[in-house]
Regions:
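N-terminal beta1-alpha1-beta2 submodule of the flavodoxin-like/Rossmannoid cofactor-binding fold
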Residues: 1-94, 171-227
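Short histidine/acidic/glycine/proline-rich micro-motifs that form metal-
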Residues: 10-12, 68, 107-110, 142
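Amphipathic alpha-helical segments in well-structured domains
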Residues: 21, 75, 79, 118-121, ...
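Amphipathic alpha-helical segments that form well-ordered structural scaffolds
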Residues: 23, 27, 120-127, 158-161
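Short, glycine-/small-residue-rich phosphate/pyrophosphate-handling segment
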Residues: 98-139, 145-154
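A conserved mid-domain beta-alpha-beta active-site/ligand-binding segment of alpha/beta enzyme cores
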Residues: 134-200
């Protein structure tokens, strides 16, 4: 199988998206007869060429971080390029696009934040006349690059397993997808304790560390655009 993966993170090769994709492609490539190419959508001048490559692949996966309950602008721009590359022929066969799947990762622990864009992506596949493979949703990804290896072991194993299954079936394994998505929403009890702990500043410690590293901690409440 010739697979094209489009990394839609503005951070490119240094992104959390790239790290997850590495383990997915490791699993995918372990299956004989498969080849994979990763294109980086941050290279916006290459969008037209990547769109043409997509039409020549046997399967396409677009992976990106969730931005404001949607997608980065470079991903939307690439989607427009895919539409522009669609043949003008009226025959259904000539307009067909390879099977299309998506991976959406975010820092939010709850899967619900990615459900709106998931519905859009399913509709997008139909509009491109592609078989919709599905959308893998994974929350709680922020900070994985600074975690000890043992904390990421299960996550990376799951993505390798997902890649191996895809390499054989050209499908996302539904059980693995469900495990990766995790909880849909925090329980009422969890939300209650979060409200109790929020005033302590416990949840701000990671951000405070970054602010201090950049000499911006004392200005964290500035409002430069307020009249």
């Amino acid at each position: 199988m010739r697979l094209l993966i489009c990394n839609g993170s503005p951070r490119g090769k240094g992104s959390n998206t790239a790290l997850l994709l590495k383990h997915f492609t490791d699993g995918f490539s372990a299956c004989g007869g498969n080849s994979v190419e990763v294109a980086y959508l941050m290279r916006t001048k290459e969008h037209a060429a990547i769109a043409e490559k997509a039409r020549g692949a046997q399967a396409v996966i677009i992976a990106f971080p969730l931005y404001a309950d949607s997608m980065p602008g470079i991903v939307k721009e690439f989607i427009e390029a895919l539409g522009d590359s669609q043949p003008k022929s009226r025959t259904k066969k000539q307009k067909e696009f390879p099977p299309l799947g998506f991976i959406v990762q975010s820092g939010f622990p709850e899967a619900v934040h990615s459900r709106t864009v998931e519905r859009y992506l399913e509709k997008l596949a139909r509009r491109l006349n592609a078989r919709y493979i599905g959308t893998v949703i994974k929350g709680g990804v922020e900070g994985i690059q600074s975690r000890p290896a043992y904390l990421n072991r299960r996550l990376f194993m799951a993505f390798r397993s997902l890649g191996r299954h895809f390499g054989v079936t050209k499908e996302f394994h539904p059980i693995t997808m469900k495990k990766l998505a995790g909880m849909e929403k925090f329980s009422a009890i969890s939300r209650f304790f979060f409200r109790l702990l929020a005033p302590t500043g416990l949840f701000d410690s990671g951000w405070d560390k970054i602010l201090k590293q950049n000499g911006a901690y004392e200005r964290r409440f500035d409002r430069p655009y307020q009249p």
